[in-house]
């Protein structure tokens, strides 16, 4: 039995060897199948400068390997930020259905229409209140307890279906400049002392108040029957007989054919105005015959008080216009001049006034605008003219040229009557019955 066992063992060994031969192949064959294609630098790889393609793109690399490529720690760090950045959108940071775009060490969320914020976390509807960017309204905004704010439009406009925009319903809505809209031009800048000519038709609400043939003051057309100006213009006026208002005027030395001359039926000033003083310096004039609205004669919008104080007052630059002196104690302008002036902080204006002996007090019924370097300012003859502010392409009356220390004097700025304080007073009078002559009306 023993020889037979040895024979079986030998057969098994031979069979196993044959099986192994079937499994294992030669070294050359194995290299041709399994061996990775050797890099170009072969065994000299560690002796040659690093390659970005070889070290970090064909396979993952370490910071040290990248450092070999750039030969600079700073450049390596810059590369490493991008290379080792990862997917910043992996945590789904965008909320409320927003989509995420991966950036270097950052991300951008693209929000759905009703949401905003870095992560689309803010619902726009929750922020639709009037104190926040005027509630998104083009003109007037009203807050409501327990419900969303609503937008409204000035007379002569109507609200569009989107609930925020206003479109004109009349041929000549207030605050628009037909001359500019027909040309598709932008609003000009410039003015008075240091200013530029306001091209014909681009200040269509400007009025020239004439005492006989002499320019008395400027004014602003508010509608077809009313012009607003400064009360101090009439300190020495005892009768309306020689007082006229010229609308559509541009060049005082020429008759251009667009002028409209109107007599004044009624002059109204606040009962608190004291001649020779600067407070409550505003006056309302009723035309004896209504103005005819044209491309060169358009009223300026009288804004609601809240809108004026919360929205318009935050706009830095406004336009002032008039035919005042081009230089202090110089000649009056022949053509209508205009300029954009920056509004100043009330506290800064008050402090400047307090530091100048004999300077009138700046009250809450006034505000300041202009350039402290004395480069641009209103001057004698501009008094009563408009300080107009544009919001979403519509112009509003925000001030009346009142007083200043000289004209364009260094360290001095123009002082304007704050029209928002008189909005209700003006509106009430514009609805009143006609009473001829010069009157004082209780304020407020």
UniProtKB/Swiss-Prot annotation:
One Gene Ontology cellular component annotation held by this UniProt entry: extracellular space
Enzyme Commission code: 3.4.21.21
Ranges for domain Peptidase S1: 192-431
Alphabetically ordered keywords of this record: Blood coagulation, Calcium, Cleavage on pair of basic residues, Disulfide bond, EGF-like domain, Gamma-carboxyglutamic acid, Glycoprotein, Hemostasis, Hydrolase, Hydroxylation, Protease, Repeat, Secreted, Serine protease, Signal, Zymogen
Catalytic activity: Selective cleavage of Arg-|-Ile bond in factor X to form factor Xa
Domain named Gla: residues: 40-84
Annotated localization: Secreted
Residues annotated to bind substrate: 377
Recorded GO MF terms: calcium ion binding; serine-type endopeptidase activity
Subunit note: Heterodimer of a light chain and a heavy chain linked by a disulfide bond.
Name the record gives this protein: Coagulation factor VII
Organism name: Oryctolagus cuniculus
Phylogenetic classification of the source organism: Eukaryota, Metazoa, Chordata, Craniata, Vertebrata
């Amino acid at each position: 039995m023993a020889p037979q066992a040895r024979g079986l063992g030998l057969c098994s060994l031979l069979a196993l060897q044959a099986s192994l031969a079937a499994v294992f192949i030669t070294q050359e064959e194995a290299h041709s199948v399994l061996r990775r294609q050797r890099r170009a630098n072969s065994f000299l790889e560690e002796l040659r400068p690093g390659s970005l393609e070889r070290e970090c793109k064909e396979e993952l690399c370490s910071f040290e390997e990248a450092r070999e490529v750039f030969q600079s720690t700073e450049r390596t760090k810059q590369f490493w930020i991008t290379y080792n950045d990862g997917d910043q959108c992996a945590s789904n940071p965008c909320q409320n259905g927003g989509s995420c775009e991966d950036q270097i060490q950052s991300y951008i969320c693209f929000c759905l229409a009703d949401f905003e914020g870095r992560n689309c976390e803010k619902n726009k509807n929750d922020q639709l209140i009037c104190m926040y960017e005027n509630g998104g309204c083009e003109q007037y905004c009203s807050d409501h307890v327990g419900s969303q704010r609503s937008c409204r439009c000035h007379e002569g406009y109507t609200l569009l279906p989107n609930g925020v925009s206003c479109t004109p319903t009349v041929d000549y809505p207030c605050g628009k400049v037909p001359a500019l809209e027909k040309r598709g031009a932008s609003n000009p800048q410039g003015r008075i002392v240091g200013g530029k000519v306001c091209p014909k038709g681009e200040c269509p609400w400007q009025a020239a108040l004439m005492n006989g043939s002499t320019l008395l003051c400027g004014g602003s057309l508010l509608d077809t029957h009313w012009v607003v100006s400064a009360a101090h213009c009439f300190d020495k006026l005892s009768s309306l007989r020689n007082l006229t208002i010229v609308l559509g005027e541009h060049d005082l030395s020429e008759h251009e054919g667009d002028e409209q001359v109107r007599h004044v039926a009624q002059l109204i000033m606040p009962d608190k105005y004291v001649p020779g003083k600067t407070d409550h310096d505003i006056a309302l004039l009723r035309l004896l015959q209504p103005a005819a609205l044209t491309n060169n004669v358009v009223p300026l919008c009288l804004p609601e008080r809240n809108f004026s104080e919360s929205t318009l007052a935050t706009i830095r630059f406004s336009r002032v216009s008039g035919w005042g002196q081009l230089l202090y104690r110089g000649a009056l302008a022949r053509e209508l001049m205009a300029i954009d002036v920056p509004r100043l902080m009330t506290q800064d204006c008050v402090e400047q006034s307090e530091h100048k002996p004999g300077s009138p007090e700046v009250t809450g019924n006034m505000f300041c605008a202009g350039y402290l370097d004395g480069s641009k300012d209103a001057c004698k003859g501009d008094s009563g003219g408009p300080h107009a502010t544009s919001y979403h392409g519509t112009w509003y009356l925000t001030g009346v040229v009142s007083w200043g220390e000289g004209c364009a004097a260094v360290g001095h700025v123009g002082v304007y009557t704050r029209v928002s304080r008189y909005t209700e007073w003006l509106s009430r009078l514009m609805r009143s019955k006609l009473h001829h002559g010069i009157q004082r009306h209780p304020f407020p």
